[in-house]
């Protein structure tokens, strides 16, 4: 992260104020203040992650993924014959915190801050699937988008999406 001295001073002051306003997180803010003031390059990269950018297209894809899971659950609940579909496979697992942290962060924002998809079970890991999911979800989306009635899926369509 490249910052001028003036920008570093402003950010340092912000962290100082935050440490006073939020005593529970004061230690974290003081640490960040020190990193900014001293310009520790390695630790400044942490801030890059905090201030990363998630393009609009990616945000829309994540919402689409979550909407697909909602449609899977609604369709499953409306089925008369569930044909051995394991309901656990319908759950939205989230994303891998180690490799897909930006996606995971957006999911948590949507659920916890925006109040969307609050009916999804975040599990004990808070939507951390602990394995890469992005490519799997994109394959599932391709199949879901090809379905003529996306919110009234048959058991066969549900299985095709899950097995994508």
Curated annotation (Swiss-Prot):
SUPFAM superfamilies: YfbU-like
HAMAP family noted in UniProt: UPF0304
InterPro entries to which the protein is assigned, alphabetical: UPF0304_YfbU (IPR005587), YfbU_alpha-helical_sf (IPR023146), YfbU_helix-hairpin_sf (IPR023145)
Gene3D superfamilies xref list: Helix hairpin bin (1.10.287.680), yfbu gene product, domain 2 (1.10.3190.10)
This protein's name: UPF0304 protein NT01EI_2691
Family from the record: Belongs to the UPF0304 family.
Domain of life: Bacteria
Pfam family, one: YfbU
